[in-house]
Regions:
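A structural signal for short hydrophobic/aromatic patches embedded in well-ordered alpha helices
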Residues: 20, 66, 126-127
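Acidic, low-complexity, intrinsically disordered interaction modules
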Residues: 23-30, 36-118
Length: 133
């Protein structure tokens, strides 16, 4: 199946979160999103932030790209220390290390969800599709 067909087949919802906390900037909005793969009925619910005044509300394509990107960050690192070093958390003191560990764990959860939702062939097709997104 092509990436376009996979993306088209996914069910997607994005709802503005009741509680707007830990935002990237005051202009960002936190959404609760869900992607469902109808091929296996597996789903993933996740938080997503964007600045709708600068771009637009979340789309299935944008959210899926971010999920795949986060998953690849975790998959490309051998362990927590590698992640902290690769993404610059190691040099910022204890607070930065804590933030980095939180980010690493979130990326690992996302990678596990992507592995659960999609087959290897689907992941390959999607990663190729988003290569230059």
């Amino acid at each position: 199946m092509t990436a376009e067909k996979i993306i088209d087949s996914l069910r997607f919802t994005a709802t503005e979160a009741d509680e707007q906390k830990d935002l990237f900037t005051p202009s960002h909005v936190l959404y609760k999103c869900r992607i469902i793969n109808p091929e296996n009925n597996r789903r993933y619910t996740f938080d997503y932030q964007c600045n709708p005044s600068a771009t637009h509300e979340p789309t299935k394509e944008d959210c899926l790209y971010c999920l795949l990107s986060d998953a690849s960050c975790a998959d490309s690192c051998t362990d927590e220390a590698d992640f902290l070093t690769e993404f610059g958390y190691i040099d910022g003191g204890a607070d930065q290390v804590r933030k980095g560990l939180k980010a690493y764990k979130a990326c690992k959860r996302t990678a596990a969800a992507i592995d659960r939702i999609f087959t290897e062939d689907e992941k390959t097709a999607l990663n190729e599709y988003y290569k230059n997104y």
